[in-house]
Each structure stands twice: as structure tokens, then as C-alpha cells.
């Protein structure tokens, strides 16, 4: 028998939860991907997508289809759905949905700074940013020469200001410092999101905590592996790890002292969930990568979110599943476009 709070949940959030579950029913199945992978041209792909929930989302494209057009339209469709959720949400769901956008904002800022470091014009970089993470001051990012300047001139009035306290320094924004800044921002963001979900309690906390714990631990594994062969010290590396995952504290300390991939794998062996992820990784170039193995595990966690009702986790899970779906469609489209059919089935199906 549902408790009072669950009945109350439906008063403010029931309509949107029902809607997101309806949208989830339109996510492409394995059979849809088999059909897409058999397409010979991008026009064939467009016709097949018209038979799914994507419908006529490419109908207004009169010229020859390109990968970037397909990618843009997929993101625009997801953005439209997300804006509908947020525009009709009540607190605390509104804040929860805003939290989802912050990771995209971080990625956009890093993309713009990195592009500027390589003398790329800002007008060329902005279209590459994810629309879920766009904000008004975005184009001004290129004027900052160090993190403190970036914060004071641009980010102080954005939601990311709260995550920026650990990033403030006078160090020049070179590639190494930009990566450190990305990881510090993500650390603060994930820890804040975790606390917010914990505060909501109930099923939202029950569903979201394992998802965010996995995200925190995935970042710790990737930070460790990417730091091998760089100037980053073990002490500095440990400061970048989010502390809201299952690895905290012992696992993170072991990762901080790891010297190579095998030692990272040994740390994963202590955690059944991550041992299975690392065991699924192939050694040859054509086999499954660690990134793919992490994506597969993420999909499982997000699909599980739909097994419970009366919680916010379904909104996060839906956005992440659609993001993977977009990656799958773009991957298949690229293989068709480049006539690289041997790898066309290397997508990650959701259902």
C-alpha cells in the first residue's frame, strides 16, 4: 500500500512521470537497430527512423543528409522533450532537472576553453556544444586566461558558481589545468547532486544513489588511467576523485597509488560490480573498450530505474538512455556514410 507521500507525489509530479514513461516506451529496440544497420544510405536511415517515435524529425532537411545534421536534430528533439518536463515541473523536481543540465554545462565550458587554446574561433565552437548545457554567457568563455578570471567574469552568475570554489587559481589555462578543472567541477557537481538526492529520501534516493555512486566511481577509474604518463602526482590525482561512490574511501586510496592499468584492474576486483565491468573488456583493438563496458553498465542501472514508481530517477534515466540512443544512431550513420560496415554493429543496444 503506497504511503501518504507517494499519493502526494502524484499531485505535483504524476503527470510528468507518466509522460516520461510513455516516452521511454518509444526508445529504439534491438529489432530497430538491426533494421537501421541494414540501411545502405543515410536516406534509407531517415526512412527507417520515420517508422519509429522519431517520426518526421528530419522532414525539413531538403539537401543531402549529413552526420552533423542528424546529430543536431537528435539533440534538438531531446532538448524539446526536456524543456517540456522542466517547464511543467514543480519543486523539488525543477531543481532535480536543473542538476541534470549542469554536467552538460561543465562539458560545454571545457570544450570552449580547449577549442580557444587551439585558436579555434568561438563561432565554430558554440554549435558543437550540447544544447542541454547552453547558457547566456557561454560565448564569453574565450576571454578568460585563468580559472579565477573565468569565474569572476563569466561563471559567477551561473549555477556552476557553487561548484567552482575548488577550481579557483591563477594558473594559466593550459591543457593539463583545463582537465584538472573539469575533474574538480565534476567532483563538486556529483557530490552536490548526491546530497540533493539523499535529502529527497524515499525511492528517489534509493534509485539515484547507486546511479550517482557508479558515475563517481567511473570518473575515479578513468581519471586514474588517463593520468598514467602525465605530470599529475598521486596526491593531486586523489584530490580529483568524487567521494560519493562505492570506492570511497579505501578503493580511492588504492586507485591513487596505482601505477598501471593492471593495478587499477586489481582495485576493481575488490568490488563485484566493477570486477564484472573490467572482465568484459577485450584486449584486441576490435573488442569491447572499457568505455563501452562502462556505458553498458550505466544502461543497466538506468533501465532498472523504471521498475519503481513515485520517484525522480526516471527523468535522469530517460535522458541518459536517450543520450546513448543518440550515440548509437550517429555511430550507425557514420558507418553507413563511410561504408565501414564491419563495425556497424558496435552500438550498445538498450532493450
UniProtKB/Swiss-Prot annotation:
<dbReference type="InterPro" id="IPR002843">
    <property type="entry name" value="ATPase_V0-cplx_csu/dsu"/>
</dbReference>
<dbReference type="InterPro" id="IPR035067">
    <property type="entry name" value="V-type_ATPase_csu/dsu"/>
</dbReference>
<dbReference type="GO" id="GO:0033181">
    <property type="term" value="C:plasma membrane proton-transporting V-type ATPase complex"/>
</dbReference>
<dbReference type="GO" id="GO:0005769">
    <property type="term" value="C:early endosome"/>
</dbReference>
<dbReference type="GO" id="GO:0046961">
    <property type="term" value="F:proton-transporting ATPase activity, rotational mechanism"/>
</dbReference>
<keyword id="KW-0406">Ion transport</keyword>
<protein>
    <recommendedName>
        <fullName>V-type proton ATPase subunit d 2</fullName>
    </recommendedName>
</protein>
<dbReference type="GO" id="GO:0016324">
    <property type="term" value="C:apical plasma membrane"/>
</dbReference>
<keyword id="KW-0375">Hydrogen ion transport</keyword>
<dbReference type="Pfam" id="PF01992">
    <property type="entry name" value="vATP-synt_AC39"/>
</dbReference>
<dbReference type="InterPro" id="IPR036079">
    <property type="entry name" value="ATPase_csu/dsu_sf"/>
</dbReference>
<dbReference type="InterPro" id="IPR016727">
    <property type="entry name" value="ATPase_V0-cplx_dsu"/>
</dbReference>
<dbReference type="GO" id="GO:0007035">
    <property type="term" value="P:vacuolar acidification"/>
</dbReference>
<dbReference type="InterPro" id="IPR044911">
    <property type="entry name" value="V-type_ATPase_csu/dsu_dom_3"/>
</dbReference>
<dbReference type="GO" id="GO:0007034">
    <property type="term" value="P:vacuolar transport"/>
</dbReference>
<comment type="function">
    <text>Subunit of the V0 complex of vacuolar(H+)-ATPase (V-ATPase), a multisubunit enzyme composed of a peripheral complex (V1) that hydrolyzes ATP and a membrane integral complex (V0) that translocates protons. V-ATPase is responsible for acidifying and maintaining the pH of intracellular compartments and in some cell types, is targeted to the plasma membrane, where it is responsible for acidifying the extracellular environment. May play a role in coupling of proton transport and ATP hydrolysis. Regulator of osteoclast fusion and bone formation.</text>
</comment>
<comment type="subunit">
    <text>V-ATPase is a heteromultimeric enzyme made up of two complexes: the ATP-hydrolytic V1 complex and the proton translocation V0 complex. The V1 complex consists of three catalytic AB heterodimers that form a heterohexamer, three peripheral stalks each consisting of EG heterodimers, one central rotor including subunits D and F, and the regulatory subunits C and H. The proton translocation complex V0 consists of the proton transport subunit a, a ring of proteolipid subunits c9c'', rotary subunit d, subunits e and f, and two accessory subunits.</text>
</comment>
<comment type="similarity">
    <text>Belongs to the V-ATPase V0D/AC39 subunit family.</text>
</comment>
<keyword id="KW-0813">Transport</keyword>
<dbReference type="GO" id="GO:0033179">
    <property type="term" value="C:proton-transporting V-type ATPase, V0 domain"/>
</dbReference>
<dbReference type="GO" id="GO:0016471">
    <property type="term" value="C:vacuolar proton-transporting V-type ATPase complex"/>
</dbReference>
